[in-house]
Amino acid sequence: EIVLTQSPAITAASLGQKVTITCSASSSVSYMHWYQQKSGTSPKPWIYEISKLASGVPARFSGSGSGTSYSLTISSMEAEDAAIYYCQQWNYPLITFGSGTKLEIKR
């Protein structure tokens, strides 16, 4: 089973700040996907196949990486971006998720 380790577990960013969340895999993976979850809702697909934005995701989000190291970046933090972000990989037949990164607004 491939283990995904996210960093940081919790972070706070000021509005307009650049934010980067990393996801490290215990073995090389071909693709990494990201989900956004807000309080009281199910996780939504956010970035798929490393860098492709899901429908409706703002262009300030981007994804990158290869092998065992991947990241999600927000170029300029907005209030609506406060959420929990999860990385996810599918290594047939197992799907594994990271433990999540909680992104808060720094006030």
Swiss-Prot record:
Any Gene Ontology CC annotation: immunoglobulin complex
Source organism superkingdom: Eukaryota
Region ranges (Framework-2): 34-48
Residue segments, region Framework-3: 56-87
SMART domains: IG, IGv
Positions of the UniProt region annotated as Complementarity-determining-3: 88-96
UniProt-annotated stretches for the region Framework-4: 97-106
Region (Complementarity-determining-2): 49-55
The keyword Disulfide bond appears for this protein: yes
Keyword Disulfide bond: yes
Region (Complementarity-determining-1): 24-33
Keywords associated with the record: Adaptive immunity, Disulfide bond, Immunity, Immunoglobulin
Disulphide-bonded residues: C23-C87
InterPro entries (alphabetical): Ig-like_dom, Ig-like_dom_sf, Ig-like_fold, Ig_sub, Ig_V-set, IgV_Light_Chain
Pfam families per UniProt: V-set
UniProt region (Framework-1), positions on chain: 1-23
Additional record remark: This chain was isolated from a myeloma protein that bind galactan.
Protein name per its UniProtKB record: Ig kappa chain V-VI region XRPC 24
